């Protein structure tokens, strides 16, 4: 049991199922998945390609909806929200970091960081203030005026992290954030996530890498749409065989 065991649940998935129909066949991307992620946790969700981890992230990030089951974000049932309401939730509560950075090439680092604040209607002066602060936090204040093509891969990912932090979200969802980076730069990005978690951010990291997952405080394995909680840093990773229901109870 981790020190976050009694913290408030941020994400609660209950018996979530997501089915795709491909070539006339039914594919269960998620099969009665149940889990709870609490405030202040640093959780890695690990699985191979096709395991369902991207579908899981999309549902947790309000980018997709389940076919059945219940999803609570900060205690609120997501299924009852409209598309516009879900967009507002994504913008205010969740910061996204993607493998491919997803930076706009014609904009500077600072302008890229300001984008989600524009959608929130934040004033230009406040946008400049906030973007400068988060770029400082990720160590890129001196690169604020540089465009993505003038930055290394690691620097681009730091800009992406800064953009995710700009709206001051409670939750960071990172999808393979080290996947396009060399090992040294990947370690630097993981160190940054650890620092953010120590500062209180709840972080969910999607990865196929055992080494990357080991740096999280808790690890959840997904295989063929089934979720298994592998426990905290004191548990031998990958050995726990926990049912989806049990995973939710023990989280």
Regions picked out by a protein language model, each given a short descriptive name:
Residues 1-19, 229-251:
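ABC-family P-loop ATPase nucleotide-binding domain
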Residues 190, 212, 228, 236-237:
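Flexible, glycine-rich phosphate/dinucleotide-binding loops
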Residues 9-222:
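ABC family nucleotide-binding domain
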Residues 219-232:
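H-loop (His-switch) and adjacent beta-strand-loop-beta switch element
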């Amino acid at each position: 049991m981790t020190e976050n065991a009694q913290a408030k649940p941020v994400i609660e998935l209950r018996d979530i199922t997501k089915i795709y129909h491909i070539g006339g066949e039914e594919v269960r991307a998620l099969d009665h998945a149940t889990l709870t992620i609490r405030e202040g946790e640093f959780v890695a969700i690990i699985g191979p390609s096709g395991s369902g981890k991207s579908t899981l992230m999309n549902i947790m990030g309000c980018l997709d909806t389940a076919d059945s089951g219940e999803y609570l974000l900060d205690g609120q049932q997501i299924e009852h929200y409209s598309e516009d309401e879900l967009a507002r939730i994504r913008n205010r509560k969740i910061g996204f970091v993607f493998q491919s950075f997803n930076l706009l090439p014609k904009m500077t680092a600072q302008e890229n960081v300001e984008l989600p604040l524009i959608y929130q209607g934040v004033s230009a002066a406040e946008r400049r203030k906030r973007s400068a602060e988060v770029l400082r936090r990720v160590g890129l204040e001196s690169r604020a005026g540089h465009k993505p093509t003038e930055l290394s891969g690691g620097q681009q990912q730091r800009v992406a992290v800064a953009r995710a932090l700009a709206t001051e979200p409670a939750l960071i969802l990172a999808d393979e954030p080290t996947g396009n980076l060399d090992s040294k730069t990947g370690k630097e990005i993981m160190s940054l996530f650890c620092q953010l978690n120590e500062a209180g951010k709840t972080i969910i990291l999607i990865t196929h890498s055992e080494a990357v997952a080991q740096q999280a405080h808790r690890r959840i394995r997904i295989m063929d749409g089934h979720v298994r909680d592998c426990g905290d840093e004191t548990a031998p990773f990958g050995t726990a065989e926990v049912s989806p229901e049990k995973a939710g109870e023990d989280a």
